[in-house]
């Protein structure tokens, strides 16, 4: 490998895509050389330069050329350790030398926004892929399919984009000096941060400053996008998640500024919340989720808000949909939230408080659709008991082989994010089933084999149940569709578990009782 040709190709790519001005080419080249510990460079023949330009023009995103540069650094002993973590830190460092400063990117963003809001986000999204902040190569590894259900098509993904931690990195973390900078992975101080073995490098992160309802916020994309233009909007202040009147103001203020995007929030309580409760933030993007496509199954009316169109959504979880004037939506959403926070229905296992701890909250999802503001509110409760120690309205234990983690807002909206282990585990199950079918042996032999396999034993009862419920005899050609259906049915059941008002006569009547309680408050 000629490292100089690789660097020149990367810089040429950056110039072609307006990441680097021609006048800054030498400056940026030297910065990249410094980042990989290289103190020399060379000139290129006309033929080489032509080949470099042609190669750069053929690149959509610079993942491969960056990987080759990082590979060179690893072979030259330039990394603390040759692990994915340290390779990623160098990868971000190199692109951080190439990207313009935030002020330049933000000025370009808002300049385009004045002419075309959609183009502004399109350009910024593209920049995040060109900078390798969005890891397009890793995201492409994810497995995804649609699953038909009685609520509409659900979206299923097996997440393979996040690399496994190397044991050497895990061991090195114990030697890291504790630091409170940045306070978390969402703080604004991450922008340009060099990272460390236990904190991702963010030299190639750029965030756009925003004003939401008079407060300072920032807009960025997720490095591991789960759907189209998956963005994160986070508070300038490191403060805990909080679902309240201001939260509804913020999400609707955002969709007023970016009507082609939705914005949603994880819950602000453990178990029903997301993985980061310590920093106030939202997730949005340009994707029509299954929940958005779901119809309203029962129209309702709220006292004093007769101008707001409202209804119960035909969805496995308990969701209200509100449509109308932005400010009126904010006030009604807050009224519903306050009613829900104090609401109990012991016959359905819903307790607002136990031992002075409150359990009720909501997931809001804001949109601007067909000329109107729209706000979905998914009702959540995080109570536990001895039967369900991980959560009463949480995936039940018999589903934990597929999904045991918290159900966050992305999954509430109908997109399953399932662990990468399922790829190999399901492949092993399909192999056992195929062998049994070919040999004409009963599937009981497969269940017995699985029960003796540490990785597969958790799936044995689950598989037996889904085979017994499958409408047609299993064939070797139908194993893929069978497994996809079994996983999809399981995810649908997971969402139903999380619903506070079940799809039973008692549950539906309980939902109506809650709506009456809102109207009587």
Summary of predicted features, one role per range:
Residues 228, 260-262, 275-277, 290, ...:
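Coil-to-beta-strand transition motifs
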Residues 246, 255-275, 284-344:
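Catalytic or ion-translocation cores adjacent to nucleophile or general acid/base/metal-coordination motifs
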Residues 204-206, 236-263:
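Helical scaffold of the NTase/Pol beta-like nucleotidyltransferase catalytic core
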Residues 1-233, 237-240, 314-316, 330-334, ...:
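Active-site microenvironments that recognize anionic phosphate/pyrophosphate groups
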Residues 270-278, 355-361:
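Beta-rich nucleic-acid/ligand-interaction surfaces
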């Amino acid at each position: 490998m000629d490292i100089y040709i690789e660097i020149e190709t990367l810089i040429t790519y950056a110039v072609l895509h307006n990441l680097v001005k021609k006048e800054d080419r030498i400056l940026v080249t030297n910065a990249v050389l410094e980042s990989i510990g290289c103190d020399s460079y060379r000139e290129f023949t006309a033929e080489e330069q032509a080949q470099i330009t042609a190669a750069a023009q053929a690149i959509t995103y610079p993942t491969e050329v960056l990987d080759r540069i990082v590979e060179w650094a690893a072979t030259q002993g330039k990394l603390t350790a040759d692990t994915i973590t340290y390779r990623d830190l160098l990868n971000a460092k190199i692109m951080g030398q190439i990207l313009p400063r935030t002020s330049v990117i933000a000025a370009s963003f808002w300049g385009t926004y004045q002419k075309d809001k959609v183009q502004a986000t399109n350009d910024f999204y593209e920049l995040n892929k060109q900078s390798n902040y969005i890891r397009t190569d890793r995201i492409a590894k994810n497995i995804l399919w649609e699953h038909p259900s009685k609520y509409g098509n659900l979206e299923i993904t097996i997440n393979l984009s996040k690399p496994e931690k190397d044991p050497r990195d895990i061991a090195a973390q114990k030697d890291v000096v504790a630091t409170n900078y940045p306070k978390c992975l969402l703080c604004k101080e991450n922008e340009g941060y060099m990272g460390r073995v236990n904190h991702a490098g963010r030299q190639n992160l750029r965030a756009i400053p925003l004003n939401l309802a008079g407060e300072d916020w920032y807009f960025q994309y997720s490095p591991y996008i789960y759907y189209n233009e998956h963005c994160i909007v986070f508070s300038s202040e490191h403060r805990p998640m909080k679902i309240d009147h201001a939260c509804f103001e913020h999400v609707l203020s955002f969709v007023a500024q970016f009507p082609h995007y939705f914005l949603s929030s994880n819950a602000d309580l453990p178990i029903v919340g997301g993985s980061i409760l310590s920093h106030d933030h939202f997730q949005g993007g340009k994707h029509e989720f299954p929940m958005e496509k779901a119809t309203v199954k029962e129209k309702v009316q709220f006292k004093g808000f007769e101008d707001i169109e409202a209804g119960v959504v035909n969805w496995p979880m308990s969701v209200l949909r509100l449509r109308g004037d932005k400010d009126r939506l904010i006030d009604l959403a807050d009224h519903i939230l306050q009613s829900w926070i104090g609401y109990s229905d012991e016959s359905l296992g819903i307790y607002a408080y136990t031992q002075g701890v409150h359990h009720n909250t909501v997931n809001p999802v804001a949109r601007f659709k067909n000329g109107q503001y729209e706000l979905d509110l998914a009702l959540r409760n995080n109570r536990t008991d001895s039967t369900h120690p991980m959560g009463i309205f949480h995936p039940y234990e018999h589903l934990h082989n597929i999904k045991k983690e918290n159900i966050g807002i992305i999954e509430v909206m109908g997109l399953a994010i399932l662990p990468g282990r399922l790829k190999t585990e399901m492949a092993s199950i399909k192999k056992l089933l195929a062998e049994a079918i070919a040999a004409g042996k009963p599937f009981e032999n497969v269940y017995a084999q699985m029960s003796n396999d540490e990785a597969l034993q958790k799936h044995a009862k689950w598989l037996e149940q889904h085979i017994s419920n499958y409408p047609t005899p299993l064939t070797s050609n139908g194993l893929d569709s069978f497994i996809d259906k079994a996983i999809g049915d399981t995810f649908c059941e997971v969402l139903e578990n999380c619903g506070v008002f079940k799809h039973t006569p008692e549950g539906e009547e309980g939902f109506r009782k809650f709506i009456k309680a809102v109207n009587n408050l």
